[in-house]
Amino acid sequence: MTVKTRFAPSPTGYLHVGGARTALYSWLFAKNKGGEFVLRIEDTDLERNSQEAVDAILEGMKWMGMEWDEGPYYQSKRFDRYNEVVDLLLSEDKAYKCYASKELLDEIRTEQEENKEMARYDANHPKIVAANAAAKEGDASVIRFRNPKEGSVVFDDQIRGRIEISNSQLDDLIIRRTDGAPTYNFVVVVDDWDMGITQVIRGEDHINNTPRQINIYEALGAPVPMFAHCAMILGDDGAKLSKRHGAVSVMQYRDEGYLPNALNNYLVRLGWSHGDQEIFSQEEMINLFSLDAVSKSASAFNTDKLRWLNNHYIKTSEPEYVANYLQWHLDQKEISLDNGPAITDVITLVSERCNTLIELADQSRYFYEDFEAFDAGAAKKHLRGVAKGPLELALAKIEALQEWTTENLHNVIEEVCAELEIGMGKIGMPLRVAVTGGGQSPSVDAVMQLIGKERVVTRIKMALAFIAEREANA
């Protein structure tokens, strides 16, 4: 039997990190078993759905690298199938029409609460029986599933173990509303049955839905999939994760400069572990993932940990991989790569210092664009009269270079230090400010090599002019 998992988001908002982790676990489980991963859009709530949300979900899935084997399927296009199954249940007396109005049900619920009874639907309540008896053909009705009254629903949750719910706690679920719209718990069963889903991995907020759905599977004679319910994700303060804890949308993390491999690595560890290992390639995640190692306890989202992982992936990933995702940020900042070194060379040089792709884009700018002014603090400290001699000597030697290599540029700096009998900082820092515009960069000889001779010469002359003007105004 082919293992089949699914991710079934509702398009009423963005793809949030909780949903993304559920999708990732489902995707990894399928890949680990050599199975298939299905994407289904649960868009039966026609009033709240939006195409914008659908597009955001698909974009988020693709950005994270979770390509689906089937789909996306849309529930809104399957209403005929749902009605067909409703009719089947009606014909077998496993479902029935209920004519009790919302007002009547509210009245009964109020009475139950006043009598300190469990508020629930009871098909045998005298008022409901009377309402059904008085109904005429054509009156508005819902369709309810006839839930078993005896026994229990027992299932082995692959994360939480054995779960048992008494049928006496479950009422007769509405499976089709008065407007003809099918309900969530019903269409999920029909979809999973039709699509051959063998494994349902979802959030723990669905545990109460599972026994209801199992009873529908059994009424239809459909195979019941295995279930696994993941614990929720909390903020670092122990409260349920929300916008106040930072970004919650997958694409917001893209916008803030995170790599998908870093986010995937972080999300997989929010509840799953393999010994003490922290860093997992996609291949390792697929090979090692197991629901047996998923925790029953909630996990706390820690942005500092995510930033650490992102820095690791920026530093250690192939430059071509980083460049692919960096390009979006370069475009946002209107940094053109037309006039400068290969971006992969820049990434190799500057990535060590960058926690996000936004920082990487900012630190790439001076390789491609000239600046009109120096950073005020760096210039005040390093572009002073004492730097004039070292910069002039360095400029002369740089202009005379026949071969533009990092080694030759390093030799220039050493020669200036030797001839003027000064420490490395007396020329290194003024040079850094001169060629980058600021006070922080990787090794200045390597930076100059990538920037190119013409730009380096122009920028050193600009720094000398700045020093001259500063002295004139002193």
Swiss-Prot record:
<dbReference type="InterPro" id="IPR033910">
    <property type="entry name" value="GluRS_core"/>
</dbReference>
<dbReference type="InterPro" id="IPR045462">
    <property type="entry name" value="aa-tRNA-synth_I_cd-bd"/>
</dbReference>
<dbReference type="InterPro" id="IPR000924">
    <property type="entry name" value="Glu/Gln-tRNA-synth"/>
</dbReference>
<dbReference type="GO" id="GO:0004818">
    <property type="term" value="F:glutamate-tRNA ligase activity"/>
</dbReference>
<dbReference type="InterPro" id="IPR020751">
    <property type="entry name" value="aa-tRNA-synth_I_codon-bd_sub2"/>
</dbReference>
<dbReference type="InterPro" id="IPR004527">
    <property type="entry name" value="Glu-tRNA-ligase_bac/mito"/>
</dbReference>
<dbReference type="InterPro" id="IPR020058">
    <property type="entry name" value="Glu/Gln-tRNA-synth_Ib_cat-dom"/>
</dbReference>
<dbReference type="Pfam" id="PF00749">
    <property type="entry name" value="tRNA-synt_1c"/>
</dbReference>
<keyword id="KW-0030">Aminoacyl-tRNA synthetase</keyword>
<feature type="binding site">
    <location>
        <position position="243"/>
    </location>
    <ligand>
        <name>ATP</name>
    </ligand>
</feature>
<keyword id="KW-0963">Cytoplasm</keyword>
<keyword id="KW-0547">Nucleotide-binding</keyword>
<dbReference type="InterPro" id="IPR008925">
    <property type="entry name" value="aa_tRNA-synth_I_cd-bd_sf"/>
</dbReference>
<dbReference type="InterPro" id="IPR049940">
    <property type="entry name" value="GluQ/Sye"/>
</dbReference>
<dbReference type="GO" id="GO:0005829">
    <property type="term" value="C:cytosol"/>
</dbReference>
<comment type="subunit">
    <text>Monomer.</text>
</comment>
<dbReference type="GO" id="GO:0008270">
    <property type="term" value="F:zinc ion binding"/>
</dbReference>
<feature type="short sequence motif" description="'KMSKS' region">
    <location>
        <begin position="240"/>
        <end position="244"/>
    </location>
</feature>
<comment type="similarity">
    <text>Belongs to the class-I aminoacyl-tRNA synthetase family. Glutamate--tRNA ligase type 1 subfamily.</text>
</comment>
<feature type="short sequence motif" description="'HIGH' region">
    <location>
        <begin position="9"/>
        <end position="19"/>
    </location>
</feature>
<dbReference type="Pfam" id="PF19269">
    <property type="entry name" value="Anticodon_2"/>
</dbReference>
<protein>
    <recommendedName>
        <fullName>Glutamate--tRNA ligase</fullName>
        <ecNumber>6.1.1.17</ecNumber>
    </recommendedName>
</protein>
<dbReference type="GO" id="GO:0005524">
    <property type="term" value="F:ATP binding"/>
</dbReference>
<dbReference type="GO" id="GO:0006424">
    <property type="term" value="P:glutamyl-tRNA aminoacylation"/>
</dbReference>
<keyword id="KW-0067">ATP-binding</keyword>
<keyword id="KW-0648">Protein biosynthesis</keyword>
<keyword id="KW-0436">Ligase</keyword>
<dbReference type="InterPro" id="IPR014729">
    <property type="entry name" value="Rossmann-like_a/b/a_fold"/>
</dbReference>
<dbReference type="GO" id="GO:0000049">
    <property type="term" value="F:tRNA binding"/>
</dbReference>
<comment type="function">
    <text>Catalyzes the attachment of glutamate to tRNA(Glu) in a two-step reaction: glutamate is first activated by ATP to form Glu-AMP and then transferred to the acceptor end of tRNA(Glu).</text>
</comment>
<dbReference type="InterPro" id="IPR001412">
    <property type="entry name" value="aa-tRNA-synth_I_CS"/>
</dbReference>
